[in-house]
């Protein structure tokens, strides 16, 4: 879990990222109202805040494992950290009675937990075919293989919203 400094930086990052997204929405609104100068300014403000958020994120990202054991780092440490974060926030949401947040975090935790199934710990490598096709639900992050499901098994999103991850590796 992040240190106190990391937690503070994560909070600032989320505030700046949210502000940038809102500026873009306000820019669209200004454009629809025919207020082009305001729309351009709001786009520029949003771009500035995006740059700020990117810099904060680069600090938050932390050290990247450049060793040959990077898969173990991902599957044994980083996934566990994300799951622990979801669990902690789930407890908090349950304690405050925030059922909407409980639902969202439960879905995200399920999607994240599935990711560990792609790693063969015995062999220390991913357990997928070289030509595997991957599909991600844009709402909960569920990762499907082979073909897109008709409905996301985690959040119920329609299959046509689930997109293939294209990569030319």
Feature map (PLM): residue ranges:
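Non-heme di-metal
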Residues: 1-169
């Amino acid at each position: 879990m992040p240190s106190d400094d990391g937690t503070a930086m994560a909070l600032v990052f989320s505030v700046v990222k949210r502000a940038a997204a809102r500026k873009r929405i306000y820019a669209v609104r200004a454009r629809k109202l025919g207020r082009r100068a305001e729309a351009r300014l709001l786009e520029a403000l949003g771009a500035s805040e995006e740059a700020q958020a990117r810099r904060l994120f680069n600090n938050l990202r932390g050290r990247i494992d450049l060793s040959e054991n990077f898969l173990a780092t991902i599957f044994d440490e980083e996934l566990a950290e994300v799951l622990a974060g979801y669990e902690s926030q789930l407890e908090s949401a349950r304690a405050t009675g925030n059922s909407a947040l409980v639902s969202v975090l439960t879905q995200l935790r399920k999607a994240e937990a599935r990711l560990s199934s792609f790693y063969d710990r015995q062999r220390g490598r991913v357990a997928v075919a070289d030509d595997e096709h991957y599909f991600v639900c844009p709402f909960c992050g569920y990762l499907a293989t082979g073909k897109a499901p008709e409905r996301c098994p985690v959040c119920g999103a329609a299959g046509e919203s689930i997109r293939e991850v294209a990569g030319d590796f």
